A protein has these predicted regions:
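Hydrophobic core of transmembrane alpha-helices in multi-pass small-molecule transporters
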Residues: 18, 97, 110-125, 312-326
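Symmetry-related core transmembrane helices of the 12-TM Major Facilitator Superfamily/SLC fold
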Residues: 177-194, 378-394
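C-terminal ends and interior cores of transmembrane alpha-helices
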Residues: 92-107, 296-308
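Cytoplasmic helix-loop-helix junction between adjacent transmembrane helices
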Residues: 116-153
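Juxtamembrane intracellular "pre-TM" segments in multi-pass secondary transporters
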Residues: 1-6, 198-227
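Short amphipathic helix-loop junctions that connect adjacent transmembrane helices
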Residues: 30-53, 242-258
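Helix-to-loop junctions at the C-terminal end of transmembrane segments
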Residues: 69-82, 273-286, 370
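Conserved MFS/SLC helix-loop-helix module at the cytosolic interface between two early adjacent transmembrane helices
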Residues: 68-105
Length: 412
């Protein structure tokens, strides 16, 4: 009976992250056209193309900056006060952010739009808390499976959100409708959490565990290498997605519906990658997932700039999407496995903060890379993917050497 309850709770968590990511990604197809197209009126008609790109970068960068600040803190609060109360707080804050975004777009108010991104980023620690909840209910054998299913939910959200948002904006002619739909979806998610998720107490302390600040947790020797790999891995993903829409708008003049279709085309392989990762995790070490996933991802990212037709782009989405999901599974499980049960929320909050915070690095480094050519952000993403594969390989070799040394010492 307990196993049935655990599985039921897990699928509610999958629905929760699906709605959370769908709500976040609903407005994504409209942000680039909203800021880059002078006819939309978000900026003055005299604004230069360069200044429009800068403001787009600021709007995109505020979200990860404040998630980097908020996610570890909210995760730590969930360790102390329980997952459900803090998850509820997150959703209320995110809902307020989406409402401000809708008003900012409707009124063409740049300050409101900027404030909305601050609120959305700071309170969007819900995915980290859901991952901590999945870790709480997992055994070492089921953790990779449970995390893979959470990833499937996130990727499904990336399919539903941009499709609904892109079509809603084009059909209605009102770009604020996508944000209002995000408000509605977040409200449904909040009700789902309040009604269906059990309110479990914090993890009982078997021994007194000294509290760690975010900086101290980041520096833990068992975690630091995997946090670095997380930053590199998501740096590649964020470089890819940050300049994904910009490339398609500038090079191919795609509209919000076409951008939404592109998001679907890359998200479907990501869902497939989560399923493949779940199957491989039954037989492979986590390091093998990290190596293979990041190499496959790097290959897809490198090929993205080559095609000029939609079907060619779709072919590059297959390795990119599959590799991203396998790489994410490898990094998330590695961090969770090396974190104390009483620090799962804080560790996964820091993980999500680094994951989304890597977008800041992507915006800064990618903006400089754009000076060399619009394809250079994708070259840098490829390099980050290769470095991640090498990092997992190096950590695996080090672990094998320590294991061999221990085996040689033990008989003596």
């Amino acid at each position: 009976m307990e196993g049935i309850k655990t599985q039921a709770t897990l699928w509610v968590l999958v629905m929760t992250v699906t709605l959370a990511v769908a709500g976040f990604s609903l407005p994504s197809p409209v942000l680039a056209p909203l800021m880059l197209d002078p006819a939309q009126g978000m900026l003055s008609p005299e604004a230069s193309d360069w200044s429009r790109k800068v403001w787009l970068g600021v709007i995109m960068g505020l979200y990860p900056l404040f998630q980097l600040l908020g996610a570890p803190w909210l995760g730590k609060l969930s360790d102390r006060y329980g997952r459900k109360p803090i998850l509820t707080l997150c959703l209320i804050g995110v809902l307020a952010g989406y409402a401000l975004m809708a008003l900012g777009i409707a009124w063409r108010s740049l300050p409101l739009l900027l404030l909305s991104r601050v609120l959305e980023g700071f309170f969007n620690g819900d995915i980290a808390i859901v991952q901590a909840m999945a870790a709480d209910m997992s055994t070492p054998k089921t953790k990779a499976r449970n995390f893979a299913r959470i990833n499937i939910g996130m990727n499904l959200g990336w399919v539903l959100g941009p499709m609904i948002g892109g079509y809603a904006a084009v059909i209605s002619g009102d770009y604020s409708l996508a944000a209002w739909l995000a408000v509605a979806m977040t409200a449904v998610n909040l009700l789902l959490i309040l009604w269906l998720i059990p309110n479990r107490p914090p993890v009982a302390a078997e021994q007194t565990l000294a509290p760690l600040s975010t900086w101290q947790l980041l520096q833990q020797p068992r975690l630091l290498p995997y946090f670095v790999l997380t930053l590199l891995s998501y740096g590649a993903v964020q470089l890819y997605f940050t300049y994904f829409n910009v490339w398609l708008v500038e090079r191919l003049a795609w509209d919000p519906v076409q951008l939404a279709q592109a998001a679907v085309l890359v998200s479907v392989p990501m869902m497939l990658g989560s399923w493949i990762g779940e199957q491989l995790a039954r037989h492979w070490r986590g390091s093998s997932l990290g190596i293979v996933g990041h190499l496959v991802m790097a290959a897809g990212m490198l090929m993205f700039v080559l095609p000029s037709q939609w079907w060619g782009l779709a072919l590059t989405f297959i390795p990119a999407g599959i590799g991203m999901s396998i790489g994410e599974l490898a990094t998330s499980v590695a961090v969770s496995n090396r974190s104390h049960p009483q620090q799962q929320g804080q560790a996964m909050g820091l993980y999500r903060g680094l994951a989304v915070g890597s977008e800041i690095l992507a915006v800064v480094v990618g903006s400089v890379a754009l000076l060399a050519g619009t394809e250079w952000p994708f070259y840098l993403a490829t390099l980050c993917g290769v470095l991640c594969a090498l990092g997992f390989y190096g950590l695996r070799r080090g672990a094998d050497r320590r294991e061999q040394a221990g085996a040689q010492v033990e008989p003596g």
